[in-house]
Amino acid sequence: MSNKSRKIRSRGGKRGVQKGVIHIQASFNNTIITVTDVRGQVIIWSSAGACGFKGTRKSTPFAAQAAAENAIKASVDRGMKQAEVMMSGPGPGRDTALRAIRRSGIILSFIRDVTPMPYNGCRPPRKRRV
C-alpha cells in the first residue's frame, strides 16, 4: 500500500460525532457542562467560569445557561444530532442549563439525574453559624 492511499488522522483533530452524552455538574459555586461521545471521550467542555463569569456570578442560573449554550454550539458544529443528559448536583443552574439544551434543537433520548445520594454514609459537616 502506497503512502498516498493511506489516511492519517491527527490525534488532536476535530472528531465528528452523531450521538453524545451531555454531563451537567451543578454545584453551588459553578456549573460545568461536559459533552462526551458514547464511550466517554470528552469532545468539548464549558463552565460558567470559562464563559467569563467570576466570583458569585458563576453560581447564577444565567451563567449556567451561557455555559450550556457555549458547549452545545460547539458540539452542534462538530455534527451532534442526538444526546443523552446526565445531571448531577444541587446547584441553581441545573434547570436553566437543561432548558438551554432543549432549545438548541438536539434530540434528547433521555435525561437522568445521577446525583450521588448517601444511604447515611459519612457524617456531614457541622452547621454554619453566620
Swiss-Prot record:
One of its GO terms (molecular function) is structural constituent of ribosome. This is Small ribosomal subunit protein uS11c. It holds the Pfam family Ribosomal_S11. GO terms for cellular component: chloroplast; ribonucleoprotein complex; ribosome. It comes from Adiantum capillus-veneris (Maidenhair fern). Keywords: Chloroplast, Plastid, Ribonucleoprotein, Ribosomal protein, RNA-binding, rRNA-binding. It comes from the Eukaryota. The keyword Translocase does not apply. Part of the 30S ribosomal subunit.
